[in-house]
Amino acid sequence: MKTKTAAILIVTLFALIGCAKQKTSAPKVDLHTAAIMGDLEAVQQHIRAGSDLNIKEPTRGSTPLLTAVVFGNTDVALALIDAGANINHQNTEGSTPLITAAFLCRAEIVKALLAKGADKTLRNNAGHTALQSVSRPFEDVKSIYESLATALEPLGLKLDYERIRTTRPVIAEMLR
């Protein structure tokens, strides 16, 4: 009886170990689409499947982390940061997740990026650091926000200009 019980336990143990080693397959939705849509479950599946978290989209060379930051999908951005996505990647415009999160006043993402050691000294193609992206008066840069919102509204981007206006000084202080 003891031998039979031991054999069952060993077989069960091997079965559990084998299941634990099975690789999760990536979902059908690509990682950038999941980042745009805020589909945290799909992003987590990609992470478990070992998908390339730094895959660049062809238009501007943004990574899923940068995409999540733009669209304000904080949970997705935090999951990608925690999973080891490149926090200092620069797209074709030189923007990084930190510069973008700062400019769009995504405070929780800025905090997470800084905690992981994001480089505050990197500059975009206009020569601006994350701090400089929030240093000018809001009225001087409101048209940039409006252009961004117009371009990305069809994909679901909504910008709260009042929140951005009032949060810019807070973000600037975080970056000092």
Give residue spans per PLM region:
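Bacterial N-terminal signal peptides
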Residues: 8-16
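Ankyrin-repeat-protein effector appendages
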Residues: 19-30, 132-176
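Start-of-repeat signature of ankyrin repeats
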Residues: 27, 60-61, 94, 127
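Ankyrin repeat A-helix N-terminal signature
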Residues: 33-38, 67-73, 100-106, 133-141, ...
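Ankyrin-repeat helical core positions
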Residues: 35, 47-48, 69, 81-82, ...
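Ankyrin repeat structural motif
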Residues: 39-47, 73-81, 106-114, 140-148, ...
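Ankyrin repeat boundary/linker residues
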Residues: 57-58, 91, 124
